[in-house]
A protein has these predicted regions:
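General marker for long, soluble alpha-helical cores
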Residues: 1-501
Length: 501
């Protein structure tokens, strides 16, 4: 405007109030320093809004304190964004409290970071929500710590996410408790991971349900273990996928017990491997029965050995099929003994074949009798050798009929000698022909007498030649009539003599 500092200083309030747009914009830093309290007081909000950034920032702290809230409201967003940190520092909380959306959004990160906690305290939650994401990212730990719960609740999820991890970590328990489920769920993985164990434990079930899988998976085992039973029981089946093996391993039995059956079924295979033996054995019948066949299949040997007989007995056939052969091999006699005949019948041929001799010998007669034909065919010669007399005699005629010729050749003398007359009578001609000469030699006269003529006729020359005179004497005339000339010609003198007597 071409006025000197002296001339500006002697302007009347009427003259100051009459300054137009161009004149206000022309005020220099030197000009504005001459303005008195009376002159500043008559400036309209529009006139203040016309002042150039240079002129506005030329006002001293004392002069700035003269600006009314009405005048402050007249600042443009450009002016607000150009205020120096020194100028900002001179403004009172009341003056800042009238700034609108455009003005607050224009504040730079440097300006926001320079605000005193007392100045921030004067801003409403709505005003704080008007800060740009860049501005919010500049909030310091001290500034965030000073925010009220009302102010915190006014931030959008996106705005909170814009804050630094350090700033979020500065939130105290009372502040985090004020966050909505949307706000909590909108935090980044690293931001949520900055919560203390005390803050984690203080989250409401509503807040917990708002967490994302990424947020849960980003927690340390210590943080997860700080969650209460109520919080854990509030996790959705989707959220359960965020728990890792280390998280599960660190949980108390009370925490594990808090999970519902659907939550247990939702555990990832990796998380399930983290369960300790005490945790596995503590699973309730409802929880254990909820495990999928894939989950059961992932149980390691230590976990399988921890299963109680109650848990084993209540396994579904689908779960039983899910057990790995290695895991099944680690079951002790008590555990195996708790398997029902229905469960035994559900085992695959591979699972049956994976049992060792001691385990096979531990099976009850009822369990043996419950084996299917396919399972019987899967028994190895080593397993057959492990069977005792009671077990062998528990096989039904149908089961005996399922024995393969290869298995017949591998049957021990003890096993063959244990067969009842009914079982022997159920053998096919191919099975009879497959019996070893040593096995036949151990049959009693009574057993031989149970053989049908067709079975006798199936005996090979080598088998007949190995029979004792007493065994031959057990054959009826009808049986002997089925012998071929070759078979008869192969008889020893002792055998022939036994027949003649």
């Amino acid at each position: 405007v071409g006025l000197t500092t002296t001339q500006v200083g002697v302007l009347t309030t009427t003259q100051v109030a009459a300054l137009n747009t161009s004149q206000m914009k022309g005020l220099t830093t030197t000009n504005v320093t001459a303005l008195s309290a009376e002159q500043v007081a008559v400036l309209s909000s529009s006139q203040v809004g016309y002042m150039a950034a240079m002129g506005l920032n030329g006002l001293s702290g004392t002069q700035l304190s003269w600006l009314t809230t009405t005048q402050m409201a007249g600042l443009t967003s450009t002016q607000a964004g150009s205020l120096t940190t020194t100028t900002l520092a001179a403004l009172s909380p009341e003056q800042l409290s009238v700034l609108g959306q455009a003005q607050l959004a224009a504040l730079t990160s440097t300006q926001v970071a320079s605000l005193a906690v007392t100045q921030l305290a004067g801003l409403s939650s709505t005003q704080l929500g008007n800060f740009s994401t860049t501005g919010l990212a500049a909030l310091t730990e001290e500034q965030v710590d000073a925010l009220t719960t009302t102010q915190i609740s006014g931030f959008s999820a996106a705005q909170l996410r814009a804050m630094t991890v350090t700033a979020i970590a500065a939130l105290d328990e009372e502040q985090t408790a004020a966050l909505t489920s949307t706000q909590v769920g909108g935090l980044s993985t690293s931001q949520f991971a900055s919560f203390s164990t005390t803050e984690i434990a203080a989250l409401s079930t509503t807040q917990v349900r708002g967490l994302t899988v990424s947020e849960i998976s980003g927690l340390s085992a210590e943080q997860v273990d700080a969650m209460t039973e109520t919080q854990l029981s509030a996790l959705t089946t989707t959220q359960m996928k965020g728990l890792a093996a280390a998280d599960i391993a660190g949980m108390s039995l009370a925490q594990i017990a808090a999970f519902s059956s659907s939550q247990v079924a939702a555990l990832s295979l990796g998380a399930l491997t983290g369960m300790a033996q005490t945790q596995i054995s503590a699973l309730t019948s409802t929880q254990f029965s909820a495990l999928t066949s894939l989950q059961v299949g992932m149980l390691n040997t230590d976990q399988v050995q921890a299963l109680t007989t109650t848990q084993v007995a209540m396994m579904t056939t689908t779960q039983v099929k899910g057990l790995s052969s290695t895991a099944l091999h680690e079951m002790n006699a008590t555990q195996l003994g708790s398997l029902t005949t229905t469960q035994m019948a559900a085992l695959t041929a591979t699972q049956i074949a994976g049992l060792d001799s001691e385990q096979v010998n531990d099976l009850s007669a009822e369990q043996i009798a419950g084996l299917t034909a396919t399972q019987v065919k899967s028994l190895t010669t080593t397993q057959w050798a492990a069977l005792d007399v009671t077990q062998v005699q528990s096989f039904s005629e149908t089961q005996v009929g399922a024995i393969t010729t290869t298995q017949m050749r591998g049957l021990t003398e003890t096993a063959v000698q244990a067969l009842t007359g009914a079982q022997l009578g159920a053998l096919s001609t191919q099975q009879v022909a497959a019996l070893s000469t040593a096995s036949l030699a151990g049959l009693t006269v009574t057993q031989f007498q149970s053989l049908a003529p067709t079975q006798v006729s199936a005996l090979t020359n080598a088998q007949i030649a190995a029979l004792s005179p007493d065994q031959l004497a057990a054959f009826t005339t009808a049986d002997l009539s089925l012998f071929s000339k070759t078979q008869m010609g192969g008889l020893t003198a002792a055998q022939t003599e036994a027949l003649s007597t």
